[in-house]
Amino acid sequence: MNANPLFPAILLILPGLVQAAIPAATDRAFADFTALPLELLPVLEGVTDRDSAEQSAEKLNALLPRVYDSRTAMTRIETLTPEVKRELLQKYEKDMRTNWGKVYEQIFRLQNRRCYNSLAFFKQFHALCMMLEK
């Protein structure tokens, strides 16, 4: 039999390499999703009247593809082991809750103000809310 002496070592190393690739991609997704509110907040907080809502509509529209991509990447968490899920939540949960909590405060504020009657802003705002709901 012609067995490669490195074969047992490869079998021990390979699972670690395969598992490491999945958390790295998911780790990036979590980092992006956690940081995304820091880009959204200035746009949402800047809306204080109809004129500022009109100006913010374009800025919000520019951010929507990032919201969609980040949200889509986050769905990959379901394919991970419970241990990896737990580790990622320990790493990001506090910042994620804090950052997204601030975004939701702004969403509720803007809903109560009816987006300051700006149709342009309302369209982008509605798209943002729909993306976050799924």
What are these regions (language model features)?
Residues 20-58, 130-134:
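Immediate post-signal-peptide N-terminus of mature secreted/exported proteins
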Residues 64-134:
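Compact alpha-helical subdomains of small soluble proteins
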